[in-house]
Amino acid sequence: MNTILLGNLIKIRWIAIFGQILAIFFVFYFINIQIPFFESLVIIFLSVAVNFYSYLEQRKNKTISDLKAFYFLLFDILQLGFLLFLTGGIINPFSILILAPVITSASYLPAFMTVILSAISIAIITILNFYYIPLNLGEEFYLPQIYNFGLLASLIITVIFIAIYAYL
């Protein structure tokens, strides 16, 4: 059993949900970047639903098993992956946040669970480098392929570094 409290994970997810909603509204309404607004909100509100369910679970148990914590963090990685797919892939400045569940896992969960979450994060990061809905910035905007490769490599290296460093 790990030492992480379910309530802490729920609070962190509420902060993420609030930040995601704020970012989507700001980008769509104030910066006027055309993103899949409704679809993005659907993905975010899935997190709201899961967090309400987690809150009900927390009323029964304050602590969470390693396996449930693993699934909790896996959901966060997948949810952010889908949101990044809708909003520009890894060139989205918020793509770095995909590291947060890996950091949490490395801090609290057994190594094999962190390795699995790291591998899934790396797979999602790699997929998002090639497949995503581009941001419609109004004019032609392309980053050089070498930049995309560098960003991909830096995110992958960071995931690996976090996973290894936590267990040294």
Labelled PLM ranges:
Residues 17-21, 74-79:
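Core segments of transmembrane alpha-helices
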Residues 6, 18, 22-44, 61-69, ...:
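Alpha-helical transmembrane segments and their interfaces in multipass membrane proteins
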Residues 21-25, 52, 81-85, 103-104, ...:
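Alpha-helical transmembrane segments of multipass membrane proteins
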Residues 1-5:
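Short, Lys/Arg-rich, polar N-terminal cytosolic tail immediately upstream
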Residues 44-49, 74-78, 93-101, 149-157:
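Membrane-embedded alpha-helical segments of multi-pass membrane proteins
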Residues 78-90, 96-116:
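Generic transmembrane alpha-helix motif of multi-pass integral membrane proteins
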Residues 47-62:
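Canonical alpha-helical transmembrane segments
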